[in-house]
Amino acid sequence: MKNKNRGFFRSSLSYAFVILAVIFLIYSFFGRSDGSVKHLSTTTFLKELKNNKIKDFTIQPGDSGVYTIAGDFKKAQKSSSSSSSTTTLLSGYQSSVTKFTAYVLPNNSSLKQITTAAQKAGVAVNPKPAASNFWGSMLTLILPTLIMFALLYWMLIGSQRGQGGSGGPGGIMSFGRSKAKPADPKQNKIRFADVAGEEEEKQELVEVVEFLKDPKKFTKLGARIPKGVLLEGPPGTGKTLLAKAVAGEAKTPFFSISGSDFVEMFVGVGASRVRDLFENAKKSAPSIIFIDEIDAVGRRRGAGMGGGNDEREQTLNQILIEMDGFEGSEGVIVLASTNRSDVLDPALLRSGRFDRKILVGAPDVKGREAILRVHAKNKPLAADVDLKVIAQQTPGFVGADLENLLNEAALLAARNDEKAVTAADIDEAEDRVIAGPAKKDRKTTQDERETVAYHEAGHAIVGLVLNDAQVVRKVTIVPRGRAGGYALMMPKDERYLMSEKDAKEELAGLMGGRAAEILINHVASSGASNDFQQATQIAREMVTQYGMSDKLGMVQLEGSSNVFVGDPNNPNPPYSQKTSELIDEEVRRLTNEAYKRAVDIIKSHPKQHKAIAEALLKYETLDEAQIRSLFETGEIPSDLVKDSQRPARPLSYEESKAALKKNGAVDNKEAEDELKRTKMIRKMKMIPSRVPIQLQKRRQPRRLQLLDAVNNKFD
């Protein structure tokens, strides 16, 4: 790369020298002046003419209408300082001159005066016609044409040399070529062992790796490997990393491109790039094509607004044709990632194109611990850092969040000139990631501090009493971002379902802040605005999605609707005005009940509430153990009890393959046992014939439903 840049700069420098030389020659040819010429004013010329110092002269009309007079002196004259600087530099100092020039305005009186003076002095006058600048005119006409043809020639020659960027050779003529960057298999060092927290997803991709390594193993049994694998999940879960790991394990060429790189301002460019991409991949088969953020080009057709989507739809049509046009034995597999699968075209998701869809969700506690260990390899950790505890404290964090957490902790440690990352650094980094940097210099009155302290203590008291689903992780009154303080609630365990009891407890916890304000200060403040926002969202989901309302019944009114604006199949709202009013009534009922419950809890624990609030005013931040100790004994403990178990780590490719076989054997045994039980029950005529319930559950993807980690931000 360094040599290429050096050659580019050398060629540019040579071109610059050539251009400067041409300009200098043109200037020398058309604009040079004689160094032995003295310029005279009109008055001086007439004076010299009357004094009989002029031998002869010529009068010639100029381009600008001014007459030019040029002639010879009878005797050599001394040169003046008005000589041209260019002439002085090139020819040296001139001691005397024999020629002169002068300019006269084109009026009859001036010309008549000059002619009369010349006749009296006996000086010959030689009139000349206006000179025609033939070469200048020809250059003005021909030069733009030559430049245009030179540019066309440069573009055509550059396009034949190969693909280039928009600023290099061939850049203008290479719009139809793919921008996919083929990665060398030898340079791809990412393996399955580098991907943590996605063990089930890696097992799903083992077959893809096996096919790329040994396609005959599948083709001889009549099996067809999936032509496309769609990696779906929220941002930051590692979809791109998984695709790189597949290419690294298979040791095959890896073509990566973004969905937005297909479409340009020119018509037909996207479809041409798709054809070029698949053509290059087939030449390098077995290979992998990875399209990142495929929703940029794969959105549902016919749902656009304004009719400006023709180019994108042509590109999508070409992708559909290419994916359904090549055979699996050609060894080209398409991997794509998206976090908006709901807007993808149904033809793109059908069998034969993206046959397999893998949900890459947020990792569980073991996955988070494994991810932390991967990102902590190059960071020195202090003895008080327990990655297992950090994993338990960060539910809902994805891989990108955990990497950012450790990076922030390392930056804080470097800022404090520490030799290792401590637990305090990680704790501060977690607060920065969740709520923003601390604003310790913000000046607040004592009344505001007390209001915030009792507000957050109210959240803590309700959370400590209603602790079946959640625990109080931390409470602080240190301002961070736009929050004046917050109470951090975490699920006790990894939750995949939320019961009605859990939802109502969470609502009561959110209402604890306003309940404390009314009980202590007897005045409401704006600090509970974020509490109400989250409480309204939870209550609305209970009513419209989860069927937790007797008045509305077990119906889903809103759900995970398609948010694609141009989708004609997405009416909003999908219910009547009367139903909308009933939803508002039920949401209001749930929030009011939660508020009354929070008031009752705080009234029954006044001493604990006051103790936690006073501790917040003194220490500003309390962790889980300190809060629980204050609630139970009224004192703050001095140390914490830590749990030690075998640390989690990401599985390698061979371990993932073995786990896949093991899980498959277990699933088959469970399925056989379930079928036997179903047949026995059917013989007893207790239930009708149907697919076993366990098999139905196994077919459904497991989705992790976690609410926001920060259950309150005191705005």
Curated annotation (Swiss-Prot):
Transmembrane segments: 11-31, 138-158
Binding site for ATP: G233, P234, P235, G236, T237, G238, K239, T240
Membrane topology category: Multi-pass membrane protein
Gene3D superfamilies: 1.10.8.60, P-loop containing nucleotide triphosphate hydrolases, Peptidase M41
Record-level GO BP terms: protein catabolic process; proteolysis
InterPro entries according to UniProt: AAA+_ATPase (IPR003593), AAA_lid_3 (IPR041569), ATPase_AAA_core (IPR003959), FtsH (IPR005936), P-loop_NTPase (IPR027417), Pept_M41_FtsH_extracell (IPR011546), Peptidase_M41 (IPR000642), Peptidase_M41-like (IPR037219)
Keywords: ATP-binding, Cell membrane, Hydrolase, Membrane, Metal-binding, Metalloprotease, Nucleotide-binding, Protease, Stress response, Transmembrane, Transmembrane helix, Zinc
Chain residues that bind Zn(2+): H455, H459, D531
Protein name: ATP-dependent zinc metalloprotease FtsH
Species this chain originates from: Oenococcus oeni (Leuconostoc oenos)
